[in-house]
Amino acid sequence: MGQKIHPTGFRLGITQEHRSRWYADPKNYPDTLQEDHKIRQYVKATLANAGISQIRVERKAEQIDLEVRTARPGVVVGRGGAGIDSLRVGLQKLLGSNRQIRINVVEVTKVDTDAMLIGEYIAQQLEKRVSFRRVVRQAITRAQKAGVEGIKIQVSGRVNGAEIARTEVTREGSVPLHTLRANIDYAYCTAKTIYGILGIKIWVFKGEIIPGQEEIANAKVNQPKRRQQKRRQQYDDRSNEG
């Protein structure tokens, strides 16, 4: 039932990594989980125009490490790091504690292959009342030029202001939802139009990840090269030839 389950949760530990890394006592677990949710909501609301792809949270004792993956690192960092400082102060006020918060900004180099950034682009265009089919076709074309093996986009709601809500699905290439080793990037976002809210889902297939293949390739690269012994060239003795 590959279409019934969240593609990221289905592949955690196989091709996807956990986006929150910490351990907590059972009595503190709900509060810590809610803190993660508040942190992500605050960062996305504060940096709405920064093209946020992922926010990863890691906790160590009294320290919180945030990894913000963005398409516009300059907007997040700000002039002289002022953006990060204001974000850190805002998070400390939100959490109501003086815990140390470290923020690491990572740039997303391939914007056209990131599912969340593709979804945000489609949502922004739909909110500007651009034609649905034109926006989806542009997003698919850009993703294919960037080298993805397959992409699937689903838009649900009153598409183009229709009286009756419907679901439009567009797919190009291969998107194997049942294959666990398939590296599928999934995202969901909403577009708030004058006709109502549209739900946008994006699946991006970036190829298969075979366990051990990368390790074998790296071992071959790092293996020291043996020097080949040069063979002596044999010369014919032609000194007695007239």
Curated annotation (Swiss-Prot):
<dbReference type="InterPro" id="IPR015946">
    <property type="entry name" value="KH_dom-like_a/b"/>
</dbReference>
<dbReference type="GO" id="GO:0003735">
    <property type="term" value="F:structural constituent of ribosome"/>
</dbReference>
<feature type="region of interest" description="Disordered">
    <location>
        <begin position="220"/>
        <end position="242"/>
    </location>
</feature>
<dbReference type="InterPro" id="IPR009019">
    <property type="entry name" value="KH_sf_prok-type"/>
</dbReference>
<dbReference type="InterPro" id="IPR036419">
    <property type="entry name" value="Ribosomal_S3_C_sf"/>
</dbReference>
<dbReference type="InterPro" id="IPR018280">
    <property type="entry name" value="Ribosomal_uS3_CS"/>
</dbReference>
<comment type="function">
    <text>Binds the lower part of the 30S subunit head. Binds mRNA in the 70S ribosome, positioning it for translation.</text>
</comment>
<dbReference type="InterPro" id="IPR005704">
    <property type="entry name" value="Ribosomal_uS3_bac-typ"/>
</dbReference>
<dbReference type="InterPro" id="IPR004044">
    <property type="entry name" value="KH_dom_type_2"/>
</dbReference>
<keyword id="KW-0694">RNA-binding</keyword>
<keyword id="KW-0689">Ribosomal protein</keyword>
<keyword id="KW-0699">rRNA-binding</keyword>
<comment type="subunit">
    <text>Part of the 30S ribosomal subunit. Forms a tight complex with proteins S10 and S14.</text>
</comment>
<protein>
    <recommendedName>
        <fullName>Small ribosomal subunit protein uS3</fullName>
    </recommendedName>
</protein>
<dbReference type="GO" id="GO:0022627">
    <property type="term" value="C:cytosolic small ribosomal subunit"/>
</dbReference>
<dbReference type="Pfam" id="PF00189">
    <property type="entry name" value="Ribosomal_S3_C"/>
</dbReference>
<feature type="compositionally biased region" description="Basic and acidic residues">
    <location>
        <begin position="233"/>
        <end position="242"/>
    </location>
</feature>
<dbReference type="GO" id="GO:0003729">
    <property type="term" value="F:mRNA binding"/>
</dbReference>
<dbReference type="GO" id="GO:0019843">
    <property type="term" value="F:rRNA binding"/>
</dbReference>
<dbReference type="Pfam" id="PF07650">
    <property type="entry name" value="KH_2"/>
</dbReference>
<keyword id="KW-0687">Ribonucleoprotein</keyword>
<dbReference type="InterPro" id="IPR001351">
    <property type="entry name" value="Ribosomal_uS3_C"/>
</dbReference>
<dbReference type="GO" id="GO:0006412">
    <property type="term" value="P:translation"/>
</dbReference>
<feature type="domain" description="KH type-2">
    <location>
        <begin position="39"/>
        <end position="109"/>
    </location>
</feature>
<feature type="compositionally biased region" description="Basic residues">
    <location>
        <begin position="223"/>
        <end position="232"/>
    </location>
</feature>
<comment type="similarity">
    <text>Belongs to the universal ribosomal protein uS3 family.</text>
</comment>
